[in-house]
């Protein structure tokens, strides 16, 4: 039927890379870059496309066209940056990552529509302890946003972990290889803890907007 299109019966070729840099003159800081590409295996073999992760980041450099049946159109790709900064004396850290699941056309596209196809996570962790032998108190907060922005009205990026051609998405045996809240979702997490020797007592709150992308698709009229 027109409501269901079977997935390809084919294995997937996945390739990714991660670079991490920790500047020696800034204690506790680490910065990184990540990129990943996947496609169906038979398509990769036919086109000898075995190192797609090293191709140009921007779509203006595509050598194979922009149509859905081109080499670039068959790729499901993404990239992002991440960082973490730990303050040992303050017993605190801040971390975050910003990723895109759809390649930008050029630098201008990235600057003018930064929200298109993006997802991010930011978090804070702080430890309070008066003396080395006293009780430890911890506070944690994390915010994850994966819902599409209003730019979807002009060009749809689809939900995270999904792709129009690689319809299996970023999954392994049916499980999403990513955020546990799932595609199109947002969340906030708070936790307060007390550690007394070997005992830990915690209270946590989590708020999840489950698949807001689907809500927008279903009721946008």
Over which residues does each language-model region extend?
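Internal, well-ordered domain-core segments that constitute the primary functional module
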Residues: 1-32
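Exposed, low-structure sequence patches enriched in small/polar residues
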Residues: 22-221
